[in-house]
Amino acid sequence: MTMTSLDIILFISAIVFLSIYYYNLFSNAKRSNGLKLPPGPKGYPVLGNLPQLGAKPHQALQAFSRVYGPLMRLRLGSVDLVVASSPSVAAQFLKNDSNFCARPPNSGAEHMAFNYHDLVFAPYGPRWRLLRKLSAVHLLGPKALDDNQNVREEELAVLARMLYERSRGGEPVNVGKEMHVCSTNALSRAMMGRRVFEKLAVGGGGVEEEEEMKKAEEFKDMVVEVMTLAGVFNIGDFVPWLKPFDIQGVVRKMKRVHRRYNVFLDKFIAECRSSAKPGANDLLSVLIGQRGKSDGSGGEITDTAIKALVLNLLTAGTDTSSSTIEWALTELIRHPDILKKAQQEIDSAVGRDRLVTESDVPKLPYLQAIVKENFRMHPATPLSLPRMSIEECDIGGYHIPKNSTLFVNIWAMGRDPSIWPDPMEFRPSRFLPGGQGEHLEVRGNHFELMPFGAGRRICAGTSMGIRVVHSTVATLIHAFDWKLPEGLTAEKIDMEEAFGISLQKAIPLMAHPIPRLAPKAYSPKMK
């Protein structure tokens, strides 16, 4: 049966009428309770402020905060959204965050993270704590990180050798892509006992390496797509009755990329199982040993839960660090005086006959300041992952309704001139002795600088991320000088952002690595 033009017009008219009626009814109910809500911009019927967020919500929310203040409220469809845009307001939400440790329902968790079976979007409770504990003990905690330090350093040595060989060809390298391969192999070795891209680590060129590089490019594209789609403000998440229509086509894309990722996970996990050594203590082996056991929430650890956790770690653990490193190298190429000073510091501490190790980093205060400044300007997650209020509460004299979604605009706080003088200037000296940020660290205790979040649901990979970013940036600038492609100057490097859960460069950094160490430094001991 087909619909006539009149049927379609009547159908659309009914939807519009019901939408306006529903919006007015709900809005009047909110206003009639007499409670003081945070200020915020006026929205549209049905969609509220959703159309005003645009393609870069972190920037739109920053602009709104200049008008409505550091604590504001928006309406996204039928959902209350509260946004913290200052350290003092963020602290009120996150210092005692028992009321904001839940996650709001979202399509990304449903369709890409195995229906909330993962760690990032799992409901706060016993199952979440179990997954977090297993990840910490066997991958992300201090002892596990120390045990796998040699793995990370070996993969950085492989990266240095690859860049050394590529430097002879005269072609620029895609920095983000190479960082992603390095991060993925290091993480998969630590987590599952083998590399995802083994042939790229072995090197030697040829058809097999070309095919593996194509596989690596496809994997990175898939990871970026997951992170991008997960950051989309999907209308169906905020206007429930529009969810079946998938107006933006987001759910269709999520399901498609999930199918691709699921095929990859099934194949790679099966390969890891078949090659696992008896008594292996890596995270995947431990998770397999936990299959069928209670997850603490009335369920059990299943193959789906294992895949969901591996997806979390391989996606967030590689995309965030590689994009952060790409931003850092971009800033250093744009500021050659800062780059030269950092190279001199590393040369003095390490020399030019070997690569940097993680143990060298504590002796490199200027490098540490560079990394902090990069975290300030280019946080991996511009908006904190969304939280949801379990109960109504009062913050800063304003009423926060139950089930409100909370975002902390980390990106905006890093560029706030009331906190950071000349915030658009890349100035690592802010974090050196005598600078305003000399006492700040990035582990969630100082809300002026919180690239990994804070509170109970701070990024589980904070410690790993800190180590990886420091050692990789140090290796890149110690082992190589960097030259831009012909016709491109530092002033003309594109600095546009591509929004998602993580903040990508819209245009990848392409640059020529120029070796600056003794040749023997580029010959890694392979495992």
Swiss-Prot record:
SUPFAM superfamilies, per database record: Cytochrome P450 (SSF48264)
Catalytic activity: a 3',5'-unsubstituted flavanone + 2 reduced [NADPH--hemoprotein reductase] + 2 O2 = a 3',5'-dihydroxyflavanone + 2 oxidized [NADPH--hemoprotein reductase] + 2 H2O + 2 H(+); (2S)-naringenin + 2 reduced [NADPH--hemoprotein reductase] + 2 O2 = (2S)-dihydrotricetin + 2 oxidized [NADPH--hemoprotein reductase] + 2 H2O + 2 H(+); (2R,3R)-dihydrokaempferol + 2 reduced [NADPH--hemoprotein reductase] + 2 O2 = (2R,3R)-dihydromyricetin + 2 oxidized [NADPH--hemoprotein reductase] + 2 H2O + 2 H(+); kaempferol + 2 reduced [NADPH--hemoprotein reductase] + 2 O2 = myricetin + 2 oxidized [NADPH--hemoprotein reductase] + 2 H2O + 2 H(+)
Pfam short name (any one): p450
Membrane-spanning parts: 6-26
One GO MF term: flavonoid 3',5'-hydroxylase activity
Tissue specificity of this protein: Expressed in young cromes.
DNA repair among keywords: no
Membrane-protein topology: Single-pass membrane protein
Cofactors (names): heme
Residues reported to bind heme: C459
EC nos: 1.14.14.81
EC top class, as a word: oxidoreductase
UniProt record, GO biological process: flavonoid biosynthetic process
Pathway(s) annotated for this protein in UniProt: Flavonoid metabolism
Disulfides per UniProt: none
PROSITE patterns reported for this sequence: CYTOCHROME_P450
GO cellular component, one term: membrane
Keyword Transcription: no
Localization per record: Membrane
Superkingdom to which the source organism belongs: Eukaryota
UniProt cross-references to InterPro entries, sorted A to Z: Cyt_P450, Cyt_P450_CS, Cyt_P450_E_grp-I, Cyt_P450_sf
UniProtKB keywords: Flavonoid biosynthesis, Heme, Iron, Membrane, Metal-binding, Monooxygenase, NADP, Oxidoreductase, Transmembrane, Transmembrane helix
Sequence similarity: Belongs to the cytochrome P450 family.
Described function: Flavonoid 3',5'-hydroxylase that catalyzes the 3'- and 5'-hydroxylation of flavanones, dihydroflavonols and flavonols. Converts narigenin to dihydrotricetin, dihydrokaempferol to dihydromyricetin and kaempferol to myricetin.
Protein name as catalogued: Flavonoid 3',5'-hydroxylase CYP75B138
Species this chain originates from: Crocosmia x crocosmiiflora (Montbretia)
Taxonomic lineage of the native organism: Eukaryota, Viridiplantae, Streptophyta, Embryophyta, Tracheophyta
Name of the coding gene: CYP75B138
